[in-house]
């Protein structure tokens, strides 16, 4: 069994890290470089940076801060937001990112997944899936979730999209359960379990972490490869070294903190 990954997520707006609840009411959490270095020093396995305004504002991610981060940290990092072409992905990767994550652009043009996989390899291509449980009990996909006023429902079942994204070349899936985002009540284990049953590539849980037990539940009950979280790390509610010690005590394999 490979070590499970602990992944802080940094939502970026205007070069600053912000965090909201269910994608609303964002609060400034600090400088992007300072937080990135802090998480690297604490033992994060990788980082995800999400330019939350890029896709809703129909612009590309700013590579200036990507270059800055690449000079400062020596752990893998992934960049998401506004990556809608091979050329944009190339700029992001050449600026120093290890992976790109696509979400709304892939929903608008699914063949983008294959284009990126063919150009850079599946190991560089992450597909982010924002999922909401609707009144009929089905989980369906949302797009442009970085801006609640522009978020759109997509008539596509989450589980169907996860299967299709893999077929097209996704090397990793990040499933963000929007109903749980920012409220710290735990990951949506039931949804993650159903995704895991269909997911042949690494699956990352996102949305809902509020206690160390929540990470253990996602790893033990849904068999995810990594757990992504934001507010509990930014606020200091959970420190990564303590989290890793706790997980080891639960017989969950994680990498050492150096």
Curated annotation (Swiss-Prot):
GO terms for molecular function: imidazoleglycerol-phosphate synthase activity; lyase activity. It catalyses: 5-[(5-phospho-1-deoxy-D-ribulos-1-ylimino)methylamino]-1-(5-phospho-beta-D-ribosyl)imidazole-4-carboxamide + L-glutamine = D-erythro-1-(imidazol-4-yl)glycerol 3-phosphate + 5-amino-1-(5-phospho-beta-D-ribosyl)imidazole-4-carboxamide + L-glutamate + H(+). The active site is at residues 11, 130. Its EC number is 4.3.2.10. One of its GO terms (cellular component) is cytoplasm. Pathway: Amino-acid biosynthesis; L-histidine biosynthesis; L-histidine from 5-phospho-alpha-D-ribose 1-diphosphate: step 5/9. It is found in: Cytoplasm. One of its GO terms (biological process) is L-histidine biosynthetic process. Keywords: Amino-acid biosynthesis, Cytoplasm, Histidine biosynthesis, Lyase. CDD domains: HisF. IGPS catalyzes the conversion of PRFAR and glutamine to IGP, AICAR and glutamate. The HisF subunit catalyzes the cyclization activity that produces IGP and AICAR from PRFAR using the ammonia provided by the HisH subunit. Heterodimer of HisH and HisF. Belongs to the HisA/HisF family. This is Imidazole glycerol phosphate synthase subunit HisF. It comes from Stenotrophomonas maltophilia (strain R551-3). The lineage of its organism: Bacteria, Pseudomonadati, Pseudomonadota, Gammaproteobacteria, Lysobacterales. The gene is hisF.
């Amino acid at each position: 069994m490979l070590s499970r990954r602990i992944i802080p997520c940094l939502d970026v707006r205007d070069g600053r890290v912000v965090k909201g609840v269910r994608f609303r009411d964002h609060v400034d959490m600090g400088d992007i470089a300072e937080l990135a270095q802090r998480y690297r020093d604490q033992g994060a396995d990788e980082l995800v940076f999400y330019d939350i305004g890029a896709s809703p504002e129909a612009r590309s991610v700013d590579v200036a801060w990507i270059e800055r981060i690449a000079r400062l940290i020596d752990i893998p990092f992934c960049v998401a937001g506004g990556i809608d072409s091979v050329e944009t992905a190339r700029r992001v990767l050449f600026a120093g990112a290890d992976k790109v994550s696509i979400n709304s652009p892939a929903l608008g043009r699914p063949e983008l997944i294959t284009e990126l996989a063919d150009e850079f390899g599946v190991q560089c291509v992450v597909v982010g899936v924002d999922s909401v449980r609707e009144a009929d009990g089905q989980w369906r996909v949302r797009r442009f979730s970085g801006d609640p006023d522009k978020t759109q429902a997509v008539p596509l079942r989450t589980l169907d999209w996860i299967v299709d994204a893999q077929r097209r070349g996704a090397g990793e899936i990040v499933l963000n359960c929007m109903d749980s985002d920012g409220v710290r009540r735990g990951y949506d284990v039931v949804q993650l379990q159903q995704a895991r049953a269909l997911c042949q590539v690494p699956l990352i849980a996102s949305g809902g972490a509020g206690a160390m037990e929540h990470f253990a539940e996602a790893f033990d009950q849904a068999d995810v490869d990594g757990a992504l979280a934001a507010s509990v790390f930014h606020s200091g509610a959970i420190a990564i070294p303590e989290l890793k010690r706790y997980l080891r005590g639960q017989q969950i394999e994680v990498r050492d903190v150096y």
